Regions:
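Core alpha/beta nucleotide-donor-binding catalytic domains of modification enzymes
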Residues: 2-221
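ATP/NTP-dependent adenylation/nucleotidyl-transfer catalytic domains that generate, transfer
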Residues: 214-245
């Protein structure tokens, strides 16, 4: 979906309140919320936002449920510069989202060279490491949702992973001064989009997420869909339970 017009963008706090009402803290990952309400209050918060539905919802929920953090809250966007004007549009959209919420914004741009999934991830992590440098504790909010658990399981299983690797993504993960927190792991990709759409919030669609070049996309669109079709129960809920065992 494209970015909202100016009137829609000026109402981001209203949209945040609406999604917060639809998704109370009790509907989010309990481990993530427990951390945010406890030790997480001592850190500086950064919302890693691509402009996609998942990270937009994560940003709005953080704003809605933790209003006291708005003065120490930064929306962080990394532009890989792989999709020309579309990439620039993503960055501009996220910048307007941050401005509309009245919080800080920081961004950086990559070299625009096509890389594999691991290389692109390393670029984003290097960016986050740089912007959080100097903070004793930096809380990085990410938009991973329930479907990502099944995708990651298949992806890592194919590469060979132990129990810890197969249980990723975790709701809370520490790395140096950064703590990655994923409150949406109880929410499906479909519900993320349904909630945003129901309140009139929009987001950006990244065409590369459907490109067969990337293994994760092939697993999502092919293997995982076949698994869902052939399974006698809901795959997403099952993988969440398995991860917790």
């Amino acid at each position: 979906m494209n970015a909202p017009d100016e009137s829609g963008e000026s109402s981001w706090p209203v949209l945040a309140a609406r999604v917060g009402a639809l998704l109370p803290l009790t509907s989010l990952d309990p481990s993530a919320i427990s951390f945010l309400q406890g030790d997480g209050l001592q850190g500086t918060w950064f919302s890693a936002c691509s402009g996609g539905a998942d990270s937009v919802l994560s940003t709005l929920l953080a704003f809605a449920h933790f209003p006291g953090r708005s003065g120490a809250f930064t929306v962080a966007h990394f532009n890989h510069c792989l999709r020309g004007d579309a990439s620039s549009g993503d960055e501009a959209f996220v910048h307007r989202l941050a401005e509309g919420l009245g919080v800080s914004f920081t961004s950086a741009r990559g070299m625009g060279t096509t890389g594999d999934e691991a290389s692109l991830r390393e670029e984003r992590l290097a960016f986050l490491s740089k912007v959080t440098n100097g903070h004793q504790t930096a809380i990085i909010l990410q938009g991973h949702q329930r479907d990502d658990i099944a995708e990651t399981f298949l992806w890592r299983l194919a590469r060979g992973a132990g129990l810890a690797g197969l249980a990723a993504p975790r709701p809370v993960r520490r790395s140096g001064n950064m703590v990655f927190v994923r409150p949406l792991l109880t929410i499906s990709r479909e519900e993320v989009r349904r909630v945003l759409g129901s309140v009139g919030a929009t987001w950006r669609e990244d065409d590369s997420n459907t490109s067969p070049i990337y293994l994760r996309n092939r697993l999502r669109m092919g293997t995982l869909e076949a698994w869902r079709k052939d399974s006698d129960r809901e795959v997403g809920a099952g993988t969440v339970r398995s991860r917790r065992l």
